[in-house]
Amino acid sequence: MSYFPWLTILVVLPIFAGSLIFFLPHKGNKIVRWYTIAICLLEFLIMTYAFCYHFQLEDPLIQLKEDSKWIDVFDFHWRLGIDGLSLGSILLTGFITTLATLAAWPVTRNSQLFYFLMLAMYSGQIGLFSSRDLLLFFIMWELELIPVYLLLSMWGGKRRLYSATKFILYTAGGSIFFLIGVLGMGLYGSNEPGLDLERLINQSYPTTLEILLYFGFLIAYAVKLPIIPLHTWLPDTHGEAHYSTCMLLAGILLKMGAYGLIRVNMELLPHAHYLFSPWLVIIGAVQIIYAALTSLGQRNFKKRIAYSSVSHMGFIIIGIGSITNIGLNGAILQILSHGFIGATLFFLAGTACDRMRLVYLEELGGISIPMPKIFTMFSSFSMASLALPGMSGFVAELVVFFGLITSPKFMLMPKMLITFVMAIGMILTPIYLLSMLRQMFYGYKLFHVPNKNFVDSGPRELFLLICIFLPVIGIGIYPDFVLSLSVDRVEVLLSNYYTK
């Protein structure tokens, strides 16, 4: 067992090192860029070393535990620890954030503040995935909003302030329910509030209170995930934000909602989750179809990709609602798979938009001729998104399918109906993605574009794309590498679940 504070270092390093950006010499943006990338690489290397040498995969319990008294008056502790559920999300955060800083290379306006906000976001995300105290979890959840709001409102399209305001209103509204749930859970049955997750797992509640707590947390997570009808901030935000910010939103921020749903609702409130799980499966199936049909009607290709993200989140919801080992592992696999694929699609959309200065599909066409590398990578990641066999999206969705089919909670006819709806959603996915590719890259409208001096992907962009493409292919060919991280922890979670 390691007593070195690995997780505390991982949480505080980005934001503290990021604050030094403002003291760097003002000799252009190059120093700031290289400094930020160096911090992200150092963080990722420390993370990889700590997990390789101090984390035991076969142990399903919480590891790398840290427990220090923080605020003595409230008996508030700094509790950190990780298990198989959080390990993959932390590694995904490190990988995507490092590449997002590389993607943000062209940012020159207020670059010091931009990179600092990215690093502050990094700290908040690592803190959330590794927290073992519900109040600390909530604090990290809220701290995340500040850098995201500033990144959305200061860098992006013409309507960026509108989209940032919409984002903060939705998420802050959900956080009110989150805070009420945290207070209710901490104060119930005790004069002294205690929010240690280890203690809360063994806490029992009256049925009505448990349902109310579950519903309050669900609203907060439904905004972040997002779950319809609380999803409307997402297309506006992705349509206006800078593409490096979109990578962090699609790759990590949406996954925080799914992680919270597993970590808090499923682990701490099993009775309520058992009651709500059929509704989660129904909502997930409806979301797959609704978002796919809505995506098909979008003229803005950034918003089309945003709605495809909403559709793919439906598989995560179904996996969580299935209450099976296979289904929950499939949901975790989909979290990681979509983290890679979604982030890259938004990066490609942003780089293409920067070159063309156009976002409406009817104005595009024929750009595969001057930009063959972007066309090749866009096509490859679109194939991954539509679940082409051999890529991570296919394995994740297939495992969720099997999880639903083998679920003992549902009768045969409802399972067949939900599976049929999911299959229709999988058929709609190639329709809206391939039609987008056809409208963007084929045809003869290239000559109507004002700026004809197109430049194809450079070495930096190709390096970034290949770095993400390798794990997408790797997971598709050998998914057990990722499933082995969570399978033991999921088994323990569900065994406790059914005994309760």
From Swiss-Prot:
Catalysed reactions listed for this entry: a plastoquinone + NADH + (n+1) H(+)(in) = a plastoquinol + NAD(+) + n H(+)(out); a plastoquinone + NADPH + (n+1) H(+)(in) = a plastoquinol + NADP(+) + n H(+)(out)
Transmembrane regions listed in the UniProt entry: 4-24, 35-55, 87-107, 111-131, 134-154, 167-187, 211-231, 242-262, 274-294, 313-333, 334-354, 386-406, 417-437, 462-482
Taxonomy, superkingdom: Eukaryota
GO molecular function: NADH dehydrogenase (ubiquinone) activity; ubiquinone binding
Record's GO cellular component terms: chloroplast thylakoid membrane
Class of enzymatic activity (EC top level): translocase
GO BP of this protein: ATP synthesis coupled electron transport; electron transport coupled proton transport
Record-linked InterPro entries: NADH_Q_OxRdtase_chain4, NADH_Q_OxRdtase_chainM/4, NADH_UbQ_OxRdtase, ND/Mrp_TM
Keyword presence, Protein transport: no
Membrane topology field: Multi-pass membrane protein
Family: Belongs to the complex I subunit 4 family.
Entry-linked HAMAP family: NDH1_NuoM
Protein's name in the database: NAD(P)H-quinone oxidoreductase chain 4, chloroplastic
Source organism (scientific name): Saccharum hybrid
